[in-house]
């Protein structure tokens, strides 16, 4: 997966 997606999930979680 793209790092941007992981970062987005981290912010949401």
From Swiss-Prot:
rRNA processing recorded as keyword: no
Location in the cell: Secreted
Covalent S-S links between cysteines: none
One GO process term, biological-process aspect: defense response to bacterium
Modified residues (Leucine amide): 13
Keyword field: Amidation, Amphibian defense peptide, Antibiotic, Antimicrobial, Secreted
GO cellular component: extracellular region
Keyword Secreted: yes
Tissues and organs where the protein is expressed, per its UniProt entry: Expressed by the skin glands.
Biological role: Antibacterial activity against Gram-positive bacterium S.aureus.
Family: Belongs to the frog skin active peptide (FSAP) family. Temporin subfamily.
Protein name as annotated: Temporin-1La
């Amino acid at each position: 997966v793209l790092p941007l997606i992981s970062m987005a999930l981290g912010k949401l979680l």
